[in-house]
Amino acid sequence: MSVTIALLISLIAQTPAAPASADEAAVRDVVKQYVDARDRSDESAIRALFTDDADQLTSSGEWRKGRENVVRGTLGSSKANPGSRTITIETVRFPAPGLAIADGRYEIAGGPEGARKMWTSFVMARSNAGWRITAIRNMLPAPPAASPK
């Protein structure tokens, strides 16, 4: 009886295993591939990173729906907003099997208006072809609140 209780307690106390570090590395690599493909304006490489139903909500409020709109918008945005893009992923979470959320900082440096510093979130789904981007959300930080007088 005590062995059964001890076994039950140990099963209940166990936390779910963390996803393999290989998955986290793969998710981070997809983000790197995305930045590299944008830098090269490589339409085919960008397209290959997204699911068919992908969407992207930009920092300007444009909502691109569907892979082809995301690809066109990404290339157009890179042309309209020149500069060196850097995405630094700070956290990767796996809220469900085959689903990843990568959050980080997004900076466009060297543009005519100086550096743009934003936040970004990538949602990815695992498929037979590996991890693919299903959604991107880019956000500008809110300005600091005014001091009370």
Regions found by a protein language model. Name each.
Residues 2-5, 9-52, 68, 134, ...:
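Short, low-complexity N-terminal intrinsically disordered segments enriched in polar/charged residues
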Residues 27, 83-85, 131:
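Proline-centered linker/hinge motifs at extracellular inter-domain junctions
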Residues 45, 55, 100-101, 132:
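General beta-strand recognition
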Residues 50, 60, 91-93, 104-106, ...:
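A mature extracytoplasmic/lumenal domain signature
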Residues 54-65, 76-80:
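A short gly/proline-enriched turn/hairpin at secondary-structure junctions
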Residues 69-116:
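Surface-exposed, charged secondary-structure patches
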Residues 117-144:
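Short beta-strand edge/turn micro-motifs at domain boundaries
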